[in-house]
Amino acid sequence: MALSPMMQQYLRIHDAYPDCLLLFRLGDFYELFFEDAKTASRELELTLTGKDCGLEERAPMCGVPFHSVNTYIEKLIEKGYKVAICEQMEDPALAKGLVERDVVRVITAGTVTDPTMLEDKVNNFLMCVFLDGKHAGIAWTDVSTGEFYVMEPEISLLGAQIARIQPMEVICNDAAALISVVGNGVRGLSGQPQAWFQRKNAEETLCSHFRLTQMTSLGLEDRKYAACAAGAMLKYLLETQKNSLEHIRSLRFAENGRTMLLDQNTRRNLELTESLRGDRKKGTLLGLIDKTSTAMGGRLLRSWVEQPLLDPEEISRRLDAVEELVKDRVLGMTLSEELEGVYDMERLMNKVAYRNMNARDCLALCASLKRIPGIRGLLLNVQSGEMTRIREELDPLEELTGLLDRAINPDAPVVITEGGIIREGYSAVLDEYREAQTSGKQWILDLESREREATGIRNLRIQYNKVFGYYIEVTRSFLGQVPDRYIRKQTLTNAERFMTPELKEVEQKIIGAQEQSVRLELQLFTEIRERIAERIDSIQRTAQALKKLDVFQSLSRTASENRYVRPLISTDGSLSITEGRHPVVEQNLKDGEFIPNDTLLDCGENRMMIITGPNMAGKSTYMRQVALICLMAQIGSFVPAKEASLPVCDRIFTRVGASDDLASGQSTFMVEMSETAHILRNATRNSLIILDEIGRGTSTFDGLSIAWAVVEYIADREKIGAKTLFATHYHELSELEGHLEGVKNYCISVKEHGEDVLFLRKIIRGGADKSFGVHVARLAGVPHPVIVRAHEIQARLEVSDINQNKIGQNILGEESVNRKNEQVDLFEYKKDEIIQEIQQIDVMAITPMDAMNKLFLLKEKARKI
């Protein structure tokens, strides 16, 4: 037995896409067969059936309706699969023999463009990595917006760049080599043909796509590694997307020294775009400052937060724009309101390129462009360079707006093949077809009235459906009155359906006019879509200007609402913050509850702050706020402080907290040391370093020794000499002030009253003389006997001059003496517990039965003491 022709067609197409699940169009369904069917039925919870395929056994099969296929594709992509969409390339009704089919697109995690499958304010990047020995080139694009970037990072920083960009999919010329360089954490990694990465082939692909004769126009003639990555990525897109990608109009070379590289630990510890609890909005810096009105602006602001600037002049230009809107809040708020009417123009251009833009998308584009004249008018008197450039780059595209206004029906349906999308008056021919339909339908109504009168059949009706066309329906009770000229067409349970030659003739005219109308509408709409495609460049430039304007209004609004100030960019490398605040933490407190703090770090005698004090006192919050203030300034934002003069930091490093890395088998201490080593290898004197509790993952003396050595290494100008905030429980490190140049002691101010301790959250000069750790344990709810015992051991250690190895012996030597006292303490604790319970009883509210039960329980507790 042989496979059926259709199954042979299926397997032939599937063989060309062996790494994909093939969705094979059959009528109104997409079907999957054989192993693909088994996989899809398991992952999508679909019923697995079978289909005759010409063999003895039926082929495993499952399918999904064409109108809901995107829901299923999204689930498969989320689970890591690639999906090939195989469509019918001709009308099955007109096909002679087997319907021609072909793959029209391959959808992968990095090539998703459907807005329902994407987050509005998050880019969906595909990345291509080219490795050549000790050199690397990377390219990344968001196919849904047309953004395209290339870079040649140092091989040692490749992993950090991948972590910064966070691509959903990575392709490369050597997957094994990439894993050896950056580890196993690369999402959606796959190797691609080496030929794509060869320089000659890559340059040909680039020149062909951008319609160039030479590479100099792209600025990549001396950047061969980036060119190889960019060309290979374009080849991958052309192979999978099956279209010309005309919305990808340019590429930008990302200079290594233009923006700050934030490693994964810093982004996580500072909770820039995701909180430590995994929340993407609440508790993050981005969630606080994102008051953008458009999806485009939201994506741009996210990229600014993840890529702080390193050029003081560029930072100042952004700050000028923000300041202009802070000073004119009416302008800022009005711009925000205008921008709310702007749709995601970047992703609309993707729809133009993919030729799946519908009439409602056209209306969205038209509505967005109509906002431009008003926005330009609002910017008429702006003075800052950035705002002036934005005004100049805004193009209202009045000709295109006028076309869309005249052509598109405001109530157009989503589907473009069913008519109703072109406005009346746009096409005289189309209006004639519509008039023919309208007059024909009126003729049908008149005929219905005439036939009722002629036959005496009161409930005679003329109706229409897609299968039988127009027909006369008569119920069985009136069949005796049906005239001979009626031609029976269909018999139903309670009625008969008939046709007349006259009705048939009019039906053909109406349906003919309707078909011609739909066909002409589709043709007209296609022409309109092509007119939009011709203006992609102008639309994208306008979108770029709008999203930047949106970010500026968002930053100005955040600054105004939270009393932020414009930071000064210091030229001497000093860092001075007066009454600085943590931007996120203060939002969770009532106005005035957050305690602000000053900070002074410079390149001389105040390079490093050794900060001592107990947990829960505010050390970590303080250090993070300093880092966040510096980062906010470098994205062009005002900062939460009374005054701030800040240097441009080339890197911000943080090592805060640690836990076991179970996936890689690393202990807490190993993770801590790896992170510390990374900082010591990469920090420079222009960096800002935040270190919290170095050395706590090992023994006391080992930890102290490591922490001491790290402080010495960072403080040494010949080695690093960076501005550093170093929090520690090792009070011995306070001795370094006066012995190491640039080191100063600070602590958290504490107020003691008897056994009670109040943390004042204020950073003051000097070292802490107590840790208050046992007090923190009591606040955390540790049982009273443990607290009592901890105080005893603490007192013993404080008066003993012993080394670490003899601590245990010293404590245990007292065990027999203290055991009796410990029992007395336990008795006192139990007695106090009973007294406390009695005091908490509400005598006026308790019922007699509850009182007896409570008395019984208290008696039992007293008996057990």
PLM features per residue range, with description:
Residues 1-324, 333, 337-353, 357-449, ...:
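Charged catalytic and DNA/RNA-contacting regions of genome-maintenance
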Residues 167-173, 502-535, 638-641, 645:
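Conserved catalytic alpha/beta cores of large enzymes that bind or transform nucleotide phosphates
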Residues 315-318, 338, 342, 436, ...:
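Intracellular alpha-helical coupling/juxtamembrane segments of multi-pass membrane proteins
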Residues 198-204, 260-264, 276, 367-442, ...:
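Amphipathic heptad-repeat alpha-helical coiled-coil/stalk segments that mediate oligomerization
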Residues 86, 109-118, 244, 382-386, ...:
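Active-site phosphate-binding and catalytic loops of NTP-dependent enzymes
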